[in-house]
Regions:
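C-terminal or mid-to-C-terminal helical accessory/interaction module adjacent to the motor/catalytic core
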Residues: 146-225
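A broad, structural surface signal
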Residues: 21, 71, 111, 135, ...
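Conserved catalytic cores of soluble enzyme domains
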Residues: 103-155, 162-171
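Phosphate-handling DNA/RNA-contact segment within nucleic-acid enzymes
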Residues: 1-116, 120, 133-134
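Glycine- and other small-residue-rich loops at beta-strand/loop junctions that grip anionic moieties
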Residues: 58, 78, 98-102, 126, ...
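Active-site-proximal structural scaffolding
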Residues: 12-17, 62, 82, 106, ...
Length: 225
């Protein structure tokens, strides 16, 4: 918890002004800590900060709250961006939520998920950065053999905010409306173009056709073609 300054060699609190969370592996062992910044006006500081990597703590190979979510009976896991999102989901009864450890989803993380479920619902932040991260996560999850659905946040920036504003029942309805990953990606392509413009319409059709053509399942290609 104490770090040596690279500037002057002094000791300082690595997690000062941060709300701290224990990071627990799937065996129930505390392997590190994560800290969320409390002063949101400090734009220069990272939103989340983890313990330094050690022989027992590798953030690429662990997921926050998986020690709890692996026991869920819901039949799927929810993957979110932040610890607060995962905690809020558990508090509101969605006990299948996990979060990456302050970094983008890795193949190690996806493979870890595949040990406990066959389906993952991605619920990243609704901003551009969150949606870009969603697009990057989809092929990583599919490579691990997981079925992927996507819930795009609306009326709130993230699950934590949505649950506090609207409650569990509204979120449950939203969750049931999650799109499969092909529908999500086709809709994302559609939003890039103005179909009233012939040139943009051609570009939309070309990009959509490219996505559909890349599908490994002949049935999917038939359905979406």
């Amino acid at each position: 918890l104490v770090t040596v300054s690279q500037k002057n060699g002094n000791l300082f609190d690595r997690f000062r002004d941060r709300l701290m969370f224990p990071i627990i592996d799937v065996r129930g062992n505390v392997i590190g800590f994560g800290g969320r910044i409390m002063n949101s006006s400090d734009k220069s500081a990272a939103k989340y900060l983890n313990s330094p990597e050690t022989l027992i703590f590798n953030k690429r190979k662990n997921l926050f709250a998986l020690n709890l979510a692996k026991k869920s009976k819901l039949g799927y896991l929810i993957l979110v961006e932040g610890y607060m999102d995962a905690i809020a989901l558990h508090q509101y009864g969605f006990d299948c939520a996990v979060a990456s450890l302050g970094t983008a989803l890795t193949e190690d993380g996806a493979n870890l998920l595949s040990r406990y479920t066959e389906q993952v619902v991605l619920i990243y932040d609704g901003d551009e950065a969150g949606q870009n991260a969603t697009q990057r996560a989809i092929p990583i999850l599919e490579k691990a053999g997981l079925q992927v659905k996507v819930l795009k946040m609306r009326d709130a920036k993230d699950p934590d905010e949505y649950l506090k504003k609207f409650g569990a029942d509204r979120f449950r309805i939203l969750l049931e409306e999650s799109a499969n990953r092909v529908e999500y990606q086709l809709n994302a392509i559609l939003k890039k173009y103005d179909l009233r413009d012939d040139e943009q319409k051609v570009q939309y059709l070309q990009e959509s056709a490219g996505l559909i053509g890349s599908l490994s399942s002949a049935v999917q290609r038939e359905v979406y073609g």
